[in-house]
Design a protein with these regions (language model features):
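Non-catalytic, topology-defining segments of multipass membrane proteins
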Residues: 1-193
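Functionally important transmembrane alpha-helices
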Residues: 189-204
Length: 204
């Protein structure tokens, strides 16, 4: 593992200790280049979440049961292209869209550290809220108006592999996966650790 990642996860203190501190104030809140530079750096907890999510997906893909599924998919008609598109959407969704949105939430709606009890309650509330939001968005995606945004995900209906979990269109990822977290954070104002734990549990 590279030294920047080690520094992000360990550094002079543990990553847990980092999440247990207040969200640092952005040095230049009005600068878009500075915002995106931080969003795509390991100073952003969302970038760490991105790396962990992709790493876990890769590990799951390497399990014996998953490998056989991938082989079956690659042997099917159009399978190699579909799998490549699924991998691409995983990187676009988790690695391109995710970090800036996470950084925005942390800058705007994250509270100072909570007590342990409040954190448990907050994680539960965020997960429940996200589940409701995802359910409503998913129902909407199955209407004639929005099915175009959901169609790609259903191309994995014969062979389901771990990468298919986040193999959704950019529009679906924004509306069904991310928007419920953004709205939940804006309404509930979680602390840094609660947000990270809720997102981690929900995407796992």
């Amino acid at each position: 593992m590279s030294s920047p990642v080690l520094h992000a996860l360990n550094g002079s203190a543990s990553f847990f200790a980092r999440l247990n501190t207040p969200q640092p104030e952005p040095t230049d809140a009005s600068s878009l280049p500075a915002f995106f530079a931080r969003a795509y750096s390991l100073e952003n907890d969302g970038m760490v979440m991105c790396i962990v999510t992709i790493a876990v997906t890769v590990l799951l893909e390497l399990l014996p049961g998953s490998v056989s599924g991938v082989r079956k998919l690659l042997k099917s008609k159009g399978g190699p292209k579909l799998y490549a598109q699924g991998v691409l959407y995983n990187f676009l969704n988790n690695g391109v869209l995710g970090p800036p949105v996470y950084e925005l939430v942390c800058n705007q709606w994250v509270s100072p550290p909570f007590s342990a009890v409040d954190r448990v309650a907050m994680v539960f509330a965020i997960i429940v809220g996200h589940s409701i939001g995802y359910y409503c968005a998913h129902r909407w995606m199955h209407t004639r108006t929005m099915y175009w945004a959901h169609r790609f995900h259903h191309r994995f209906n014969v062979v389901v592999v771990p990468v298919s979990a986040n193999a959704v269109s950019l529009v679906e990822y924004i509306i069904a996966y991310m928007l419920p977290f953004v709205v939940g954070a804006a309404l509930l104002r979680p602390d840094r650790l609660s947000l990270f734990a809720a997102v981690g549990l929900r995407v796992s």
